[in-house]
Amino acid sequence: MGSRVAKSFGAQLAVVCVGPKPKELYAGRVSLARDTLAKWEIYHPGIDVLRWAFYDLKSSGFLENLDENGFNPLNMVEEKDRYRMVLPGSYGQDIDLILREGEIIDELRRECSEDEYTVSIIGGSKGRNMAHDLLQYLPTSVLVIKNVDLDRNYRILLCVDDSSATDRAVRFGAIIAKQMNFPVTVMTVSKTEEFGPGYSGAAESASSHLESQQ
């Protein structure tokens, strides 16, 4: 789903895997230099995660399926406190595969702060408070993907009010709805039995914007 969102906006996509540092690295027996990363990738499960993501993006059609360019850990380069795979531009998309080590929230905050990301897309975590913490602490908009079936016809529930963030949410939702052909329901909720002009105006404005995008 993340690749579909990125394609809808013509945006650069970064796939980030955060995991603990393998015990072999703590023991000093393995170095993550480029020449040893491929040799010792068996010790680093994050490499397998990035490999899976790479081939999933190819099989979905997001990346051009070129047989001569495969997933090669030798193309991992160290940058500050992360490792990034350099992919050939011939894949037809601007994409980074990034490996970070540490606590997931801390590392994602660092990643979002070091690069100019607009949206962070995360899966529904089994951790009870993980999604809530990410929504609270990441300095980007956050899209939580939960129990997605790519073969299902989805509908977007676009929640609006009179806050300043509503306009951005409407524009974002409209682009996704148009590119993915998703129907949209606009909803606003009032704390009282009457809807003030702010809430009513927000709903009308959202509906008008969606109609203009059809």
Located regions from the model:
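Short secondary-structure capping/turn micro-motifs that flank functional sites
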Residues: 22-23, 73, 128, 151, ...
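Structural beta-alpha unit
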Residues: 40, 55-120, 212-214
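Gly/Ser-rich helix-loop-strand patches that form or flank binding pockets
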Residues: 1, 6, 97-152
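Short, contiguous clusters of charged residues that form electrostatic/catalytic patches at enzyme active sites
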Residues: 48-51, 102-106, 110, 168-171
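Aromatic- and Gly/Pro-rich amphipathic surface segment
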Residues: 41-55
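Residue-level "edge-of-site" marker
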Residues: 19, 70, 125, 148, ...
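Small/aliphatic-rich secondary-structure junction motif
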Residues: 1-43, 155-213
